[in-house]
Amino acid sequence: FAEICEDVWVALPPSTLAALAGASVIVNLSASNITVGKDEYRHALTANQSARTLSAYVYTAAGPGESTTDLAWDGQALIYENGTLLAESRRFVWEPQLIVADIDLERLSQERSRTTSFGANRRVHREQLKAFRRICLELELPGGALELERTVARFPYVPSDRHLRAKRCGEVYAIQTQGLAKRLRS
C-alpha cells in the first residue's frame, strides 16, 4: 500500500485501514521538507505507525535536489517493522542511495493473528475495508543460500544493552512477584 507524504500525519492515516484490509508493507513517498527536529519526529511517527498497524513501514523523503533557497529536503529514508528500525539512509547526500532490509512478513502475520484488538478493529471497520482491492503476489525466491541483511540476536528476548536488560529483568521480577502475591492472598 502507498501513502503520500502527510497521509501518515493525520489522525486516521489511510495505512491504518489498509493494514486492517491486509496490507503488510506500507510505503510513504514523501515530499516533506526538513526542519530542525523533524528527523526525530519522522522516526517517532514511522515507528508508531508500523507498530500500530503491525506492518513494515517504508518512509522516503525527497532529497537535496529538490531544495531551493526557501525550503530544504534531506532525502531521509526509513524502514520500520512493527516499531523496530531496520534501516536508515544517510541524510543530505547528493548521490542516489538505496536502503535494504529483510522484513519478516510471517512474524507480522503471526502478530496480527495473536493481537485480539487487531482482529476486533477489522470487524469494526468491515464495511470500510471492502473498498480495498486485494492484490496477492507470489514471490519466487532465488536459489541457493540467502544472506540476511538483518542480524538475528542469539537471545532475541534478552536485551544486549546492560541497562535495558536490568530494567527488563526488574519488570519480569515485579510481574512474577505481583502474580505470586495475588495468589497467596486468594
Predicted features along the sequence, with ranges:
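A generic secondary-structure micro-motif detector
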Residues: 4, 35-36, 170
